Amino acid sequence: PLRNQVDDLSNLLPEYAWLGIGREDGKTRGEYAAIFYRKGRLEVLESGSFWLSETPDVPGSLGWDAACVRITTWARFKDKCTGNEFFLFNTHFDHVGITAQAESACLLLKQIKDIAGDFPVIVTGDFNCVENSEAYRIMTGAASGSQKDETDHMVDAFYASLHGNHGAVVSFHGFDEEIQKAKEENGCDFERIKIDYIFVKNGIKVLQHGILDEKFNGRYPSDHSPVVSDIVIDR
């Protein structure tokens, strides 16, 4: 979302606080990979952002063959009720550059390892890539040449869910109801149309996963369907 959209969400969600920066300048310009969190339940212990590029600490840096500047925002949270700590990374991969997608996946995994260590980790975002893409395979450790250390890789909550997936299998529809309906009813290979993911590792148990395709006042609230999950930190 852009800053005005972040502000709208903030006004509509008074029980939530948020963190993040604009991807174009590291301040307010451009899209955010903002993280909203329930402030009565979670305490932010530390947070930051990095760019999906060869120079991840340089604000506004464009990576590889990407068409747009891309960013990841992360935070370390403490659950005020249980005392459990975990990290959440929210990202948005490029929609054009295949090399950028794969390199972004490698960078993201490296940053997660460096920043979060052995803490429980949740990764959310629009990855703009399908399950048979190199980027997805890197994220899940299935790519050729991937390191064998399983701690470096993530698990797709869609498959880890103890109670399966609720709702749609399409996460992007572009506001087009007919496309959504055709993809669901005609047996379209969902691996080619699911591009939004929740990944987990290090003691995260996924109870439920869902892709919600409901409308609000007769209209989809976004060109992507919300992807949600119920999780438990089990360690």
Report residues per predicted region.
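Stable alpha-helical elements in mature extracytoplasmic
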Residues: 5, 9, 101-104, 108, ...
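Short, solvent-exposed aromatic-acidic interface loops
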Residues: 49-57, 93-94, 161-163, 211-216
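Hydrophobic/aromatic residues located in beta-strands of well-ordered beta-sheets
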Residues: 18, 88, 121-123, 154
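Structured beta-strand-rich core segments of catalytic domains in phosphoester-bond hydrolases
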Residues: 1-89
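Metal-dependent phosphoester-hydrolase catalytic domains
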Residues: 41, 99, 110-121, 129-235
